[in-house]
Design a protein with these regions (language model features):
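A short, N-terminal "cap"/entry segment at the start of jelly-roll beta-barrel domains
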Residues: 1-36, 71
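Short beta-strand segments in beta-sandwich/barrel cores
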Residues: 48-50, 66-71, 92
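Glycine- and acidic-residue-biased ligand/ion/polar-headgroup-sensing regions
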Residues: 57-73
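A cytosolic small-molecule/anion-sensing beta-strand core signal
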Residues: 64-65, 80-81, 98
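Short acidic-glycine-tyrosine-enriched beta hairpin
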Residues: 73-89
Length: 115
């Protein structure tokens, strides 16, 4: 069993985001190309965003710190610490209303050869 402190990782990623010109930093804590499930801790500084992009598959977003806004062409959701949302299977963007950290969980089709 592997465990991690999401609180400590959130602080680490916020520190890295503050040093990055993009105003963001991320670390995958589970998954990758060999797994169907992927979890990523993503820090975004206030006023920065992940521009509109296609949905990577079935996904959820949980706010670990701060305040974020998830938008699609037809809808918008705002979340703060402890809030979560199922990301719709359409193009969307994520913006930080204040310095924020989220846990993004994505399920993608299993690669060939994995069962």
């Amino acid at each position: 069993m592997q465990s991690i402190s999401l609180t400590a990782l959130a602080e680490e990623q916020l520190t890295l985001a503050r040093q990055a010109r993009s105003g963001r930093a991320a670390r995958t804590i589970h998954g990758g190309h060999e797994h169907a499930l992927r979890q990523t801790v993503l820090a975004l500084l206030s006023g920065h965003e992940l521009a509109e992009h296609d949905s990577p598959g079935e996904a959820t977003l949980q706010v670990l710190r701060g305040h974020v806004r998830l938008t699609t062409a037809r809808d918008a959701w705002e979340g703060t610490v402890g809030d979560g949302v199922t990301i719709p299977p359409e193009r969307h963007a994520l913006a930080a209303v204040e310095d924020s950290v989220v846990l993004l969980t994505v399920v993608t089709p299993r690669p060939p050869g994995l069962s």
